[in-house]
Regions:
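Short coil/turn segments at beta-strand junctions that form active-site/ligand-binding loops
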Residues: 36-41, 81-84
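Short N-terminal segments immediately surrounding and downstream of signal-peptide cleavage
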Residues: 16-34
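A generic local structural motif
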Residues: 24-29, 45, 71-74
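Short hydrophobic beta-strand that contains or immediately precedes a catalytic carboxylate
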Residues: 39-44, 57-60
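Extracytoplasmic strand-loop-helix segments at the start of, or within, the mature domains
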Residues: 30, 44-55
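Sec-dependent N-terminal signal peptides
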Residues: 3-13
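Rhodanese-like catalytic fold shared by cysteine-dependent sulfurtransferases
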Residues: 13-22, 50-87, 91-143
């Protein structure tokens, strides 16, 4: 039984890691290039968003909490289902983040087809701010 559970959890983790992703370097280049920009949602904690965040990103709140998921649901409900959406948090490595998976699952269930996770290998400061990618200085999170 333990082997079955272990195999199931490993398989589940592998599926989670196969979700569409974008690397910080590629996303920064996309933001700086001309053309259509994706809608960007910060699905993490308010303290991180208030400190520094990706320019143009909207604060949805922690997707690990019902209020954060409802905020994200309301924010995307006006968007076309084929609109490009990028989610990020930055509290910890993205594959261990308590906020990324619930946010992606919600958008998938709602029928959004172009949702990506910004891969933050360590945290937002180290993987986005330190390399010099664009940030906006702290703005009060509305949630």
């Amino acid at each position: 039984m333990k082997r079955v559970l272990l195999c199931a959890s490993v398989a589940f983790a592998a599926v989670a890691l196969q979700l569409p992703q974008i690397q910080p370097k590629d996303f920064a280049a996309q933001l700086q290039a001309g053309g259509d920009k994706p809608v960007i949602f910060h699905v993490g904690f308010a303290v991180l968003y208030r400190s520094k965040h990706i320019p143009g990103s909207e604060y949805a709140g922690p997707a690990s909490q019902p209020a954060g998921l409802e905020s994200l649901r309301a924010a995307v409900s006006k968007l076309p289902k084929d609109r490009e959406i990028v989610l990020y948090c930055g509290c910890c490595p993205w594959d261990k983040c308590p906020n990324m998976k619930p946010a992606q699952e919600l958008l998938r269930e709602m029928g959004y087809t172009r949702v990506k996770a910004l891969v933050i290998p360590t945290n937002f400061a180290k993987d986005w701010i330190d390399p010099g990618y664009p940030v906006e200085l702290g703005e009060a999170a509305k949630k």
